């Protein structure tokens, strides 16, 4: 199960030997173990481990990760700090409107443009961060969209320890805020007793 999950995850998101991640979640957490450790090692990428939460930004600047694996609570905390700083800059709210317009551009080009517009935000994350993988709980769609506006490629997924653990996930090409993606290769999903949502 674990090996097939690694292969399936790497079909959803491109991770190369040139990539680096900064690990902040405990390795006994199955999501971190799969997404932040086994998949990274299998792809030949590098892992740095944070020194402490109080030194997280310093660790980002030192290790310059290209991929960040997080849970929604951590992204919510980081998000509130970023948005507060962006809005504090003269014209900061206008930058967010520009960021929203940029996300309507096609694919990777929109992320490249947004990363230039929000260069200071990207510098705080070491200047190399491209992709944020989020799992273990639902990510607020507004936070998802704000990270996209800032020029980050956000992918969400869902799973259980019993599914080793990832069973559905966004792919690099199919991303919809407020969702967790489609079943990964080798997985099937079925909604039982659907409600209005």
What are these regions (language model features)?
Residues 68, 109, 113-197:
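Conserved AMP-binding/adenylate-forming
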Residues 3-20, 27-120, 128:
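Conserved AMP-binding/adenylation subdomain of ANL enzymes
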């Amino acid at each position: 199960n674990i090996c097939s999950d690694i292969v399936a995850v790497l079909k959803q998101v491109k991770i190369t030997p040139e990539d680096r991640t900064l690990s902040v979640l405990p390795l006994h957490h199955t999501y971190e173990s799969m997404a932040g450790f086994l998949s990274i090692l299998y792809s030949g990428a590098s892992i740095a481990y944070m020194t402490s939460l109080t030194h997280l930004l310093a660790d980002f600047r030192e290790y310059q990760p290209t991929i960040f694996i997080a849970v929604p609570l951590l992204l919510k905390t980081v998000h509130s700090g970023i948005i507060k700083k962006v809005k504090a800059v003269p014209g900061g709210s206008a930058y967010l409107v520009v960021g929203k317009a940029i996300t309507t551009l096609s694919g990777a080009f929109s992320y490249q443009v947004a990363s230039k517009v929000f260069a200071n935000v990207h510098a705080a994350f070491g200047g190399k961060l491209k992709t944020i993988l989020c799992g273990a709980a639902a990510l607020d769609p507004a936070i998802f969209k704000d990270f996209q506006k800032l020029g980050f490629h956000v992918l969400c997924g869902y799973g259980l320890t019993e599914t080793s653990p990832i069973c559905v996930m966004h792919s690099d090409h199919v991303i919809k805020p407020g969702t967790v993606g489609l079943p990964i290769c080798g997985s099937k999903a079925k909604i039982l007793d659907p409600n209005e949502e």
